[in-house]
């Protein structure tokens, strides 16, 4: 899995997550708006004349005290018109009919067609039936008081189908207070006015289920993306580690094929004007072991070997030693090919910093005996001491100037060397192909 594909999957998953979040958020807003409930409170103002103790007749006016109480304790029904209502409060004529569940319930309505308000306790039948029975008796309004649990609570009563009469609910204490006054034959007048508008929001079960499912799906998508991402990341890391191990093995093979020399006293590497090791920035001393790379740069063996294992390139010119030696990461054919660059060229290497770049041969395709190398009719003997001895011919090509040829014999010697190397390279390639097959 390439990095571009992983990034594309990451972007797709992130976009999906954001779109899902916005979609769920909008739907949640819609569900919230759909579940809003609007209801109104009602001010209940009652007025009555309470007789003084010892008075013969209640409401006669003599010795009576006028009481007025007003509180925002009522709540309009769901289908009730939101308007004012006034009238005398009455209950059912008989105690058995006070629940007003029977359509034939009779109320003690005042004479002369005065407006009256029916007071009915909760229970035994629906609010709709109670309100309809009072409406059929020409009540101006219906007041239902709560009974039982949560006596101080009022609700928005549903009474669909009976929408032409004002209907409110009051708490049980207020209702029982009015009932006690009526049982004492005290006339109670009630005035109902509109109170505060309220907007209540409810969370429906449908919206909760939908949001929960959407959230779960969103989390599953995110979790699946995370699992996919980390699996691909793990596979990529493993592949990278395997590649590094293969490259490390190939680097070890390549390092084993590179020439190693021991600096001796009198070698030109020990001279003060010779370049230092580019890794440790120290000069070369006798008995120092150096590694010679295919690019003819040399370094201390202990300095350059760790570098080559990690980077597989020359610290100076960045030449890849695997490519220079023709060793792929899984090469098997190159294991038995010893490399001796100095002997193949007939002399010690020349450092590039000094201005002389030597002409090199692809050592990975040349197999020569370490002691004796035969090139055509030319035999070159390698002395254990790599320093040039008197009488030896060292063939190098300087990048700044061409070496002068002293005679025709020198030209013949160079041509023989080139032809011989070509023949040896061809035969070596054939042997390599046979080993592979």
From Swiss-Prot:
Pfam families: PA (PF02225), zf-RING_2 (PF13639)
ZnF RING-type span: 277-318
Membrane topology (Extracellular): 35-207
Main localization category: membrane
Glycan attachment residues as annotated in the record: 45, 124, 152, 185
Ranges for domain PA: 80-182
GO cellular component, one term: membrane
One of the record's GO molecular function terms: zinc ion binding
Segments traversing the membrane: 208-228
Keywords associated with the record: Glycoprotein, Membrane, Metal-binding, Signal, Transmembrane, Transmembrane helix, Zinc, Zinc-finger
Signal sequence region: 1-34
Segments on the Cytoplasmic side according to the record's topology features: 229-437
InterPro entries, alphabetized: PA_dom_sf, PA_domain, Znf_RING, Znf_RING/FYVE/PHD
Location in or out of the cell: Membrane
Topological relation to the membrane, as annotated: Single-pass type I membrane protein
PANTHER family given in the database record: E3 UBIQUITIN-PROTEIN LIGASE ATL42, RING FINGER PROTEIN 128
Protein name: RING finger protein 150
Organism: Mus musculus (Mouse)
């Amino acid at each position: 899995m390439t990095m571009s594909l992983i990034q594309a999957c990451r972007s797709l998953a992130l976009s999906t997550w954001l779109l899902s979040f916005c979609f769920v958020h909008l739907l949640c807003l819609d569900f919230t708006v759909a579940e809003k409930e609007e209801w109104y409170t009602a001010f209940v103002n009652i007025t009555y004349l309470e007789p003084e103790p010892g008075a013969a007749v209640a409401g006669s006016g003599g010795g009576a005290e006028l009481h007025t109480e007003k509180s925002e304790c009522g709540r309009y029904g769901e289908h009730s018109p939101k308007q004012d209502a006034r009238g005398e409060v009455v209950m059912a004529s008989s105690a058995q009919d006070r629940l007003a569940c029977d359509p034939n319930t009779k109320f003690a309505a005042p004479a002369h067609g005065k407006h009256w308000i029916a007071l009915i306790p909760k229970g035994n039948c629906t609010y709709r039936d109670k309100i309809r029975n009072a409406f059929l008796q020409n009540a101006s309004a219906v007041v239902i008081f709560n009974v039982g649990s949560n006596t101080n609570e009022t609700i928005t009563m549903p009474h669909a189908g009976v929408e032409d009469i004002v209907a409110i609910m009051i708490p049980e204490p207020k209702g029982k207070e009015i009932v006690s006054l009526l049982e004492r034959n005290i006339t109670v007048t009630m005035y109902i006015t509109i109170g505060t508008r309220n907007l209540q929001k409810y969370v429906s079960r449908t919206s909760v289920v939908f949001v929960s499912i959407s959230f779960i799906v969103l989390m599953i998508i995110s979790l699946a993306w995370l699992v996919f991402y980390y699996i691909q990341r793990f596979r990529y890391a493993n592949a990278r580690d395997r590649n590094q191990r293969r490259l490390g093995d190939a680097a070890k093979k390549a390092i084993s094929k590179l020439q190693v020399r021991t600096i001796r006293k009198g070698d030109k590497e020990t001279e003060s004007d010779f370049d230092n090791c580019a890794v440790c920035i120290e000069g070369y001393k006798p008995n120092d072991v150096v590694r010679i790379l295919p690019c003819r740069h040399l370094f201390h063996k202990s300095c350059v070997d760790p570098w080559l294992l990690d980077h597989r390139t020359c610290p100076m010119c960045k030449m890849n030693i695997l490519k220079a030696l023709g060793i792929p990461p899984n090469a098997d054919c190159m294991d038995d090919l010893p490399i001796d660059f100095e002997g193949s060229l007939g002399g010690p290497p020349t450092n590039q910093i000094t201005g002389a770049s030597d002409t090199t041969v692809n050592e990975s395709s040349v197999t020569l005996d370490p002691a004796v190398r035969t090139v055509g009719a030319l035999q070159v003997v390698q002395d254990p001491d790599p320093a040039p001895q008197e009488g030896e011919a060292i063939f190098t090509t300087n990048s700044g100037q061409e070496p002068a040829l002293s005679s025709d014999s020198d030209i013949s010697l160079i041509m023989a060397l080139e032809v011989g190397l070509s023949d040896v390279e061809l035969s070596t390639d054939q042997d390599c192909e046979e080993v592979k097959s």
